């Protein structure tokens, strides 16, 4: 069933369906009248759905799911990281809650630069002040309906009773085993006495994390920033060469900032503001909006290259705007997008010097995304990160969660630069939580992990829904073509089925060198390269609330319907 431009006059909704990502993966579509929660693990999605069934709203459910991800997807999120929360309230109010990690007051630019030069991006010296829990607690207090203790309870139970990691989680553990071995605490959590992956056991229990979460449920998030937990964190971090002190934790506050707004083919786009990457998605869509929908109607080489060129331009403008904040307003200006659209050629890729990219926003790998829509029409698009897989690769034994490695993203060379580690400076992420509204209702709630590829992933799923009229399941499962700027800039494509070789050849002829090609069936660790766009939304035809988990990272959609 189509949702986009073609979806205004379509047949009635199909029952629950599975769209295939050939030849082995499927994106399962869940429909509900009571709300949906979509996250990278079943446990997290069910934790959020539990809050919906208890009478909570989308904010409560998103908070519960985010905390549960810290237990069930510890390589990508947790109490030691950052959270970015885009909220749409049914009464028509949009809010962005920024829980970015911050530079501690004692951070030494010379030390950080020496580590960066040496290629060291983990360890206690890379730990910034965690802001994620502050954002979650702020959102629950101001926009939720359930007590904070109730929101934390599912995560406590998961840590206490244990989880079974999915295949992609096991693949990440195996791939980053050496990072775990660098920390006795993380080794003890995830590896057994023979240094073999502990998830081979029936359940992975995390008793230290369970104790920490239980304290937070009883005393609230203030304990994390101003109580015994804060003191324990600061003592361990500073004793091991890090810079986070109790004063830094005490000063941490979540920030509310105005979201950005754009418009694409008659749909309203709500996005996270700079320094995040939501503005780049809006600009890419505004650029694509200068071309007729027919140019994007089919997933042929021409539509793929058009989308990639729009994303390349938008990423370059984002990086420039992050370095020069007065330019940020241009990113959502349709006149600017119209001018930039004239650069795009139909016969070849733009050269880098034609786009004029600049160094800029941080590319984050250890990240995740969840989406929620409740029965009242409230929606949350939430992204979170600990920066690298397992963050800094260190954890305090008594607390049981890995710290972020966000200080490794700052640049200590230029004191006047936007990425200089000044005290209090916030991380500039590539995360892009988004909400697409139709007549004020959340038609699509979306975001993704995936470092610099996030803008491509999110833009492409929106195009799939709006321009190609795909259902959410088909839009998420459709093979992707993305642009990556981590390392040498390059295109990457998922290929499957008839014509795959011709598609790759067409991209190379267009001027994209060294196209990274992922053929099916892939390894789970390779499939993750193309993001994890867990989506939710209201079907404009039936009014059903729909959730679709991205199969690339074992995404799961859970319903708020009574059990």
Cite the ranges covered by each PLM segment:
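N-terminal signal peptide c-region/cleavage motif recognized by signal peptidases
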Residues: 11-14
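Glycine-rich phosphate/pyrophosphate-binding beta-alpha loops
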Residues: 270-278, 367-371, 383-394, 448-455
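Active-site rim segments in enzyme catalytic domains, especially the processed small/beta chain
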Residues: 71-95, 243-245, 378-444, 468, ...
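Extended C-terminal subregions enriched in glycine
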Residues: 376, 425, 458, 467-527
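Short, well-structured alpha-helical segments that form the helix of a local strand-helix-strand
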Residues: 59-66, 149-160, 232-234, 298-315, ...
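Noncatalytic scaffold domains of N-terminal-nucleophile
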Residues: 17-46, 50, 56-219, 224-226, ...
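Internal maturation/activation junctions in enzymes
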Residues: 290-385, 398-399, 406, 513-519
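Short, small/polar residue-rich loop motifs at catalytic or cofactor-binding pockets
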Residues: 256, 364-367, 429-431
């Amino acid at each position: 069933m189509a949702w986009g431009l073609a979806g205004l006059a379509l047949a009635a909704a199909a029952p629950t369906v599975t769209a295939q990502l050939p030849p082995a993966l499927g994106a399962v579509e869940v429909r509900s009248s009571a709300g949906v929660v979509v996250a990278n693990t079943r446990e997290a999605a069910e934790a959020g759905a539990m809050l919906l069934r208890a009478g909570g709203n989308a904010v409560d459910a998103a908070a519960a799911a985010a905390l549960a991800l810290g237990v069930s997807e510890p390589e990508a999120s947790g109490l030691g990281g950052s959270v970015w929360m885009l909220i749409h309230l049914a009464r028509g109010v949009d809010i962005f809650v920024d829980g970015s990690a911050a530079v501690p007051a004692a951070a030494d630019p010379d030390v950080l630069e020496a580590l960066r030069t040496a290629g060291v991006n983990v360890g206690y010296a890379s730990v910034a002040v965690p802001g994620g829990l502050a954002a979650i607690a702020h959102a629950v207090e101001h926009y939720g309906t359930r007590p904070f203790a109730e929101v934390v309870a599912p995560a406590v139970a998961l840590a206490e009773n244990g989880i079974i990691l999915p295949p992609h989680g096991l693949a990440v553990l195996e791939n980053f085993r050496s990072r775990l071995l660098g920390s006795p605490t993380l080794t003890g959590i995830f590896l057994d006495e023979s240094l073999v992956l502990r998830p081979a056991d029936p359940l992975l229990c995390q008793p230290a994390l369970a104790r920490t979460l239980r304290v937070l449920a009883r005393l609230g998030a203030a304990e994390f920033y101003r109580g015994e937990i804060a003191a324990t964190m600061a003592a361990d971090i500073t004793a091991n060469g890090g810079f986070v002190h109790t004063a830094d934790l005490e000063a941490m506050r979540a920030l509310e900032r105005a979201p950005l707004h754009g418009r694409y083919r008659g749909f309203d786009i709500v996005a996270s503001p700079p320094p995040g990457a939501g503005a780049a998605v809006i600009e890419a869509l505004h650029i694509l909006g200068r071309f007729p929908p027919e140019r994007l109607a089919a997933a042929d080489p021409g539509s793929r290259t058009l989308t990639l060129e729009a994303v390349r331009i938008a990423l370059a403008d984002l990086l420039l705007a992050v370095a020069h904040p007065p330019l940020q307003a241009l990113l959502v200006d349709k006149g600017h997008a119209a001018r930039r659209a004239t650069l795009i050629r139909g016969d070849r890729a733009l050269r880098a010097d034609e786009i004029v990219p600049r160094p800029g926003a941080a590319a984050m790998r250890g990240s995740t995304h969840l989406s929620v829509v409740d029965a009242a029409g409230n929606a949350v698009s939430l992204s979170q990160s600990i920066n690298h897989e397992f963050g800094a690769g260190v954890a305090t034994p008594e607390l049981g969660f890995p710290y972020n490695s966000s200080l490794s993203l700052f640049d200590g060379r230029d004191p006047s630069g936007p990425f200089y580690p000044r005290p209090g400076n916030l991380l500039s992420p590539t995360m892009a939580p988004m909400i697409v509204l139709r007549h004020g209702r959340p038609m699509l709630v979306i975001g993704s992990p995936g470092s610099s590829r996030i803008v491509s992933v999110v833009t492409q799923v929106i195009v799939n829904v709006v321009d190609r009229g795909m259902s959410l399941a088909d839009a998420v499962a459709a093979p992707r073509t993305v642009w990556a700027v981590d390392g040498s800039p390059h295109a990457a494509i998922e290929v499957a089925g008839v014509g795959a070789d011709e598609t790759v050849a067409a991209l190379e002829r267009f001027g994209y060198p060294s196209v990274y090609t992922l053929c099916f069936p892939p390894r789970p660790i390779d499939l993750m390269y193309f993001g994890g766009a867990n989506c939710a939304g209201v079907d404009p035809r039936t009014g059903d609330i729909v959730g679709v988990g991205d199969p690339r990272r074992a995404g799961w959609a859970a319903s708020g319907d009574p059990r």
